[in-house]
C-alpha cells in the first residue's frame, strides 16, 4: 500500500508540473501519456459505487489485459467478463478556455468512463481509438477516473467468438490526456488527387471546432518535404466548421514506395487574432497504385510483386497489451525479412503499427473485424457500420494503407438464425462497400473467402491452403492460375502451416498417396478431410519445403499479384487446445516471442537485400542415419554464390538460381561423420562481399530404440533464470529423436516456471520435438535449491534439484 501511495504522489506531481507549464503558454495544446500508476479491480459489477468501495485493487500500468496468461494456460476457456480501472488525476488549474479529454487508443470490448462519479462517455468496439470529453466534469485539484471495460461474449459486437483468436479484455493500448483551446482543429483529412513522377497535388480538409462561432480565425498549413524543407504554405480565413486548403502543381514529388518510403509533413495552425491556438501534424506520402485486371499489382507505375505476411496483435506474457517498442519490433522484423505488405488480421491495430508501416515502407490491408459469425440483426449491423466508419476516419491519412477489408470468412458458423443467408449478407456487404467508397474513394475494398460476395468488392482472396488443409503444395501454380482467370482483381491471402520448433525428420510426410493432391480449398469442418494438418508431422523442414515451393512459384510468375503468408508470429487461440503447444496456432515463422523459425530464412532468401546465409537447420543439431549415406542439406541465402564446407573441406561452390527448387539450387549431399560435424556456408555477393553461417551437427549411425525414461538437465541463462530440459532416452542412453509425446513440467520448490507463455520454452505442457522439451524457470530469490519434475502418462515423474548460488 505504501508503494501505491508513493506512485500516486509522484503521478500527482508530474501532472501538476505538466499543466502549469502548458497553461502558462499562449499556445496551450497538450497531449500527455497517462499509462502509469493505475489501479485494477477484477470485478464485474455494473455499479460504480461498488467499485469505489472495493478494497482489492491492484497497482498496474497500461497497456493491460486480464487475459495475459489465462488465454494460454491449461484450463479450458478464458476470462470474458468485466473489470475496472481507476486513476487519480490532480489538475492544479482549470482554464475555462480549454477543452479536456481522454483519448483511448483501444479498450476491449465495451467501455464506460466515469469522472468524479459521473458517466463521461462510452464506446463499443475494442480495436479502434475513441475520445471522451471530460471538460465539464473535471475540477481543480483531485479528479477520480473510473473505467469499466467488458469483454463478455456479446453477439451484437464483432468479432464473433468463433474467430480463431482470443478477444483480450482490458485497456490494451495507450491512454492520453488531451487539452486543447476551445477553438481547435478536430481532424485533418488529407488526399492526393493527382500524383505522378513529375507533379502532385495535395488537398487538406480541416474540421474545426468553433463552438462560439468566432469570426477572426485563420488556418495556416505548411508542407515540408522528407528532408524538412518547406515546399508550400498557405493561410486562409476560417468561416465554417470545414476549411479546405489545396496545394497544386507540386513539382517532382519524392514518391512513397516500399523501398523509399518518403514522407512529407503537413502542419496546420489555427490562429485567433493572430495568436496560434492549436496545431495538428500529419505525415503524407505521394503514391498511386493499381490492380491490373487479371494481372499484377502496380505501385507508382511499376510492377510490384506483393510479398506479404499477416500480423496478430499479441506477445508472449503480454497478450494484446503490448508496448510500442514491442509493436515496432514486430514490424521491423517483418521488414528485415524483406516483406513489402502486411495484412492486419483480423482487426485494426495499434497506432504504432500504422506509423511503423508508413515509415518502413509496408503496404497495409486494414481489416474490419467481421470474422465469422455470419450476418446479425439491426443492432449488430449498426455496430458494424459504425466500426467501419471509425476505422476509415481514424486511419485515413496513412499512405501505407491501400485496402479496406470488409471481412474474413464472414458467413462461416453463423451466430444468428439465418445468419448465413447469402442474399441478406450480400445486401449488407454492399452497404459496407458503399460506406467505404463514400468515406474513401481512393482505396480498394476487399474480402477473403466469401465467394458469394466476391463481385461486390474491388479485390478478392479465395482460400488456397495447398499442402496443409487440402492437397499438395505442388498444386499451387494450378490454383493461382484458376483464380487469376476467375477474379478480376485476385490476391492470395493466407497460406502456410503449423511447425513445432525443433521438430525435424529426414523424410517429412508430404501426403503422397494419402491425400488428394489437387485440392487446395479449406473445409469449414475438418473431421472428414484428409490433409497434412491432420496427418503431417508439423516438422520445421516440411514447412520450409512448403514455403520454398510457394515462393518458387510466386517469384517466377510474371502475372501474379502476390501472396500473403499466414501468419508472421505464433498466436494464441481458444480453438486449438490439442496443438503441440496447447491453445497456440503455430503457423508463425517466428515464435510468440518473435524468435525466427527456419521458415523465416526461406522468406528472407527470396525477399531481403541484406546478404546472409542460413544452413538448415540450427534447431536440428542431433541427427542419425546409416553410415556412408549422404544427406541432402539446404542453404538459404540471397547471395549470388555459396560454398559449403564440411570439416574444413569445400563441397563446392554453387550459383543461386531462382528457377531451381529447393533452396534455389543451393543444396549439397553431405556424408556426415560420426560425432561432431562442422558445416560452414560462405556466401559471396555480386560486389564481392562475403557472409557466412556455421552449424555444428552431432551425428550417429545407430538408430534409437523405444523411449524408456525422461532425463532432466539444466543450464543457467544470462538473465539469471534456468533452462530446464527434458529428453527422452532409450535403454542405450540414446536420445529418442522420434519421440513426440506431451510432457508436463512442474516446479515443486525454489522458484516458478515461465508457464502460459505459448512459446517453446514457456509452456508447462508441450509435445516433445525430436525427443526434447524445455522450460524456463525463475528462482524465487532466497537461494534455496529449485526442485523440478517432468512427467507424462508413460513416465510417472523424473526429478531434478538445481543448486542456486
Regions found by a protein language model. Give the residues of each.
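Accessory carbohydrate-binding/adhesion or oligomerization-edge regions at the termini
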Residues: 24, 28-73, 144-148, 154, ...
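Extended substrate-binding grooves/exosites of carbohydrate-active enzymes
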Residues: 62-69, 152-155, 164, 182, ...
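Edge beta-strands of extracellular beta-sandwich domains
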Residues: 234, 279-284, 688-701, 796-805
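Accessory beta-strand-rich segments of carbohydrate-active enzymes
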Residues: 32-34, 39-43, 75, 80-187, ...
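Short, hydrophobic beta-strand segments
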Residues: 134, 246-256, 667-673, 764-781
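Beta-strand-rich structural segments
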Residues: 204-208, 266-269, 633-637, 713-714, ...
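Extended acidic/polar, glycine-enriched regions
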Residues: 139-142, 205, 209-292
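Beta-strand-rich binding/interaction modules
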Residues: 115, 199-236, 243, 631-653, ...
Amino acid at each position: 500500500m505504501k508503494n501505491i501511495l508513493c506512485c500516486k504522489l509522484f503521478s500527482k506531481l508530474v501532472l501538476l508540473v505538466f499543466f502549469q507549464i502548458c497553461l502558462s503558454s499562449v499556445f496551450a495544446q497538450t497531449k500527455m501519456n497517462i499509462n502509469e500508476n493505475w489501479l485494477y479491480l477484477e470485478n464485474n459489477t455494473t455499479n460504480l459505487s461498488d467499485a469505489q468501495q472495493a478494497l482489492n485493487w491492484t497497482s498496474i500500468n497500461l497497456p493491460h489485459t486480464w487475459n495475459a496468461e489465462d488465454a494460454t494456460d491449461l484450463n479450458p476457456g478464458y476470462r470474458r467478463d468485466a473489470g475496472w480501472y481507476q486513476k487519480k488525476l490532480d489538475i492544479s488549474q482549470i482554464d475555462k478556455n480549454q477543452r479536456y479529454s481522454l483519448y483511448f487508443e483501444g479498450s476491449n470490448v465495451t467501455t464506460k468512463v466515469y469522472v468524479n462519479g459521473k458517466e463521461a462517455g462510452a464506446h463499443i468496439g475494442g480495436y479502434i481509438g475513441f475520445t471522451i470529453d471530460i471538460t465539464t466534469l473535471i475540477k481543480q485539484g483531485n479528479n477520480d477516473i473510473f473505467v469499466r471495460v467488458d469483454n463478455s461474449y456479446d453477439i451484437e459486437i464483432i468479432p464473433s467468438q468463433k474467430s480463431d483468436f482470443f478477444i483480450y479484455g482490458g485497456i490494451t493500448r495507450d491512454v492520453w490526456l488531451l487539452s486543447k483551446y476551445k477553438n481547435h482543429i478536430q481532424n485533418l483529412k488529407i488526399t492526393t488527387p493527382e500524383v505522378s513522377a513529375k507533379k502532385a497535388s495535395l488537398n487538406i480538409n480541416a474540421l474545426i471546432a468553433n463552438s462560439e462561432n468566432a469570426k477572426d480565425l485563420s488556418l495556416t498549413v505548411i508542407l515540408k518535404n522528407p528532408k524538412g524543407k518547406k515546399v508550400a504554405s498557405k493561410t486562409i480565413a476560417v468561416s465554417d466548421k470545414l476549411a479546405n486548403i489545396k496545394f497544386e502543381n507540386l513539382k517532382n514529388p519524392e514518391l512513397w514506395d516500399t523501398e523509399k518510403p518518403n514522407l512529407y509533413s503537413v502542419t496546420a495552425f489555427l490562429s485567433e487574432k493572430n495568436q496560434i491556438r492549436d496545431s495538428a501534424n500529419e505525415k503524407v506520402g505521394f503514391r498511386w497504385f493499381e490492380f491490373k485486371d487479371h494481372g499484377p499489382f502496380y505501385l507508382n507505375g511499376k510492377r510490384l510483386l506483393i510479398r506479404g505476411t499477416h500480423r496478430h496483435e499479441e506477445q508472449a506474457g503480454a497478450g494484446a497489451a503490448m508496448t510500442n517498442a514491442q509493436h515496432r519490433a514486430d514490424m521491423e522484423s517483418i521488414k528485415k525479412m524483406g516483406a513489402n505488405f502486411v495484412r492486419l488480421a483480423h482487426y485494426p491495430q495499434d497506432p504504432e503499427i500504422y506509423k511503423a508501416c508508413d515509415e518502413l515502407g509496408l503496404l497495409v490491408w486494414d481489416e474490419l473485424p467481421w470474422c465469422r459469425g455470419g450476418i446479425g440483426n439491426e443492432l449488430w449491423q449498426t455496430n458494424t457500420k459504425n466500426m467501419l466508419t471509425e476505422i476509415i476516419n481514424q486511419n485515413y491519412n496513412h499512405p501505407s494503407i491501400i485496402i479496406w477489408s470488409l471481412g474474413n470468412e464472414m458467413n462461416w458458423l453463423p451466430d444468428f438464425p439465418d445468419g448465413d443467408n447469402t442474399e441478406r449478407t450480400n445486401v449488407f456487404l454492399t452497404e459496407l462497400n458503399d460506406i467505404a467508397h463514400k468515406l474513401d474513394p481512393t482505396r480498394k475494398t476487399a474480402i477473403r473467402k466469401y465467394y458469394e460476395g466476391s463481385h461486390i468488392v474491388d479485390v478478392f482472396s479465395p482460400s488456397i491452403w495447398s499442402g496443409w488443409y487440402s492437397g499438395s503444395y505442388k498444386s499451387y501454380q494450378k490454383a493461382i492460375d484458376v483464380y487469376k482467370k476467375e477474379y478480376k482483381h485476385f490476391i492470395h491471402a493466407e497460406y502456410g502451416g503449423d511447425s513445432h520448433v525443433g521438430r525435424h525428420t529426414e523424410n517429412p510426410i508430404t501426403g503422397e498417396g494419402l491425400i488428394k493432391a489437387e485440392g487446395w480449398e479449406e473445409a469449414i469442418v475438418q473431421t472428414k478431410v484428409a490433409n497434412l494438418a491432420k496427418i503431417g508431422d508439423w516438422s520445421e523442414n516440411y514447412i520450409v519445403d512448403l514455403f520454398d515451393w510457394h515462393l518458387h512459384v510466386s517469384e517466377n510468375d510474371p502475372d501474379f499479384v502476390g501472396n500473403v503468408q499466414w501468419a508472421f508470429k505464433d498466436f494464441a487461440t481458444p480453438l486449438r487446445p490439442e496443438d503441440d503447444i496447447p491453445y497456440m496456432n503455430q503457423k508463425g515463422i517466428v515464435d510468440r516471442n518473435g524468435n525466427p523459425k527456419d521458415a523465416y530464412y526461406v522468406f528472407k532468401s527470396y525477399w531481403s537485400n541484406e546478404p546472409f546465409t542460413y544452413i538448415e537447420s540450427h534447431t536440428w543439431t542431433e541427427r542419425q542415419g546409416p553410415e556412408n549415406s549422404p544427406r541432402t542439406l539446404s542453404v538459404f541465402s540471397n547471395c549470388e554464390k555459396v560454398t559449403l564446407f564440411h570439416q574444413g573441406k569445400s563441397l563446392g561452390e554453387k550459383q543461386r538460381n531462382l528457377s531451381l527448387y529447393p533452396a534455389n539450387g543451393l543444396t549439397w549431399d553431405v556424408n556426415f561423420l560420426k560425432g561432431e560435424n562442422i558445416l560452414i556456408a560462405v556466401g559471396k555477393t555480386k560486389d564481392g562481399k562475403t557472409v557466412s553461417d556455421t552449424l555444428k551437427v552431432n551425428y550417429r549411425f545407430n538408430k534409437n530404440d523405444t523411449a524408456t525414461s525422461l532425463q532432466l538437465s539444466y543450464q543457467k541463462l544470462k538473465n539469471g533464470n534456468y533452462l530446464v530440459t527434458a529428453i527422452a532416452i532409450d535403454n542405450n542412453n540414446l536420445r529418442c529423436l522420434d519421440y513426440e509425446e506431451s510432457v508436463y513440467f512442474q516446479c515443486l520448490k525454489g522458484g516458478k516456471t515461465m508457464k502460459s507463455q505459448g512459446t517453446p520454452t514457456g509452456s508447462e505442457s508441450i509435445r516433445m520435438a525430436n525427443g526434447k522439451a524445455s522450460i524456463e524457470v525463475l528462482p524465487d530469490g532466497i537461494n534455496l535449491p529449485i526442485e523440478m519434475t517432468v512427467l507424462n502418462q508413460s513416465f510417472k515423474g523424473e526429478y531434478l534439484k538445481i543448486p542456486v548460488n
